[in-house]
Every structure is written in structure tokens, then in C-alpha cells.
Amino acid sequence: MPLPESLRATPRGNASPPDTIDHTDADAVGRGVLTMMWTFDTTSDTAPFDASVRAAQTGWLTEAYAALLRTHRPRAVPGAQWQEWASHRAHTTVTLHKAEDAAKPADTATEAWRQWVVTATPHGRDHWTAEPVTALAYVRLIRKDTGTAWLVDRVLTR
């Protein structure tokens, strides 16, 4: 199924194009996916979830996770925060800080977990900036074998 026009747009922000990421580096793939999933642009996106659907098209996700994101429909319309951002024609810039947990499973040749604090700061085209939104993200990455590309299999946020 082709993406709607709004999801084919390139949002403003700091998401990296998929071909600029080292797919054999779990950190780089996780960082790239999280940055894309939190790069919103209210001039082309209808809701924050559109960024996750865009990420599903990059080739950075397992097919099962990409399919889940493409078919998921949020249960509610965007709220007051999104409406405020939209009134300023805002886009987000994303910063990530590793927040490794001692209880995190050790990497294996085919599975890695990463944890980041994600901060998305909305910037309006009218020079308005709002308080950043912060979340803790847990990313599970898998690959077929050593030396092959890492794929994000799951992102959990709190």
C-alpha cells in the first residue's frame, strides 16, 4: 500500500536518511530509528504517529514491526499539545542520551537492547519554541548473523 502524500514529505528536523546509517552498528540503527520516530512536522504530519509510519518505510525495522506500525491506528485524535504545535507550524528536533541500565541483557551476536532518553523540542516557523517532550525508550534490535544489518524489532517507551 503506498504511503499517503503527507507521509512521503520530508519533515523538517534532524532525522538521518536511511542510507547514511551504518546498519551493522546497533547504536547507529537504534539512534536513527528513534530520531525518525520523534521527528514530527505539523505542516505535513496529521499526528505524531505519522513519524512512526515513516520509520516503517526505511528498512531499519523488522518486517513484522514495520507492518504493525503501518496498520496501527491511534485510538484518539491528536490532543491540545499537537494543536498548539500546529498553530505555530512546528517541527521537532530530537536529542538522544544513552541511559544504559545495569539490568539490560548482554548483547549477543543476533540480539541487542539499547536504552535512550529521547527529547523532542518543538520549534515553530514563527520562531516559537515550546518545552521539550521527554521519554525513555527501550529498543530491541535483532539480526540474522554477525556482520549483517541490525533491524529494530520493538520500541517501548515510558
Where are the language model's segments positioned?
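Juxtamembrane and targeting peptides
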Residues: 1-44
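Structured, amphipathic secondary-structure segments that form assembly/contact surfaces
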Residues: 46-158
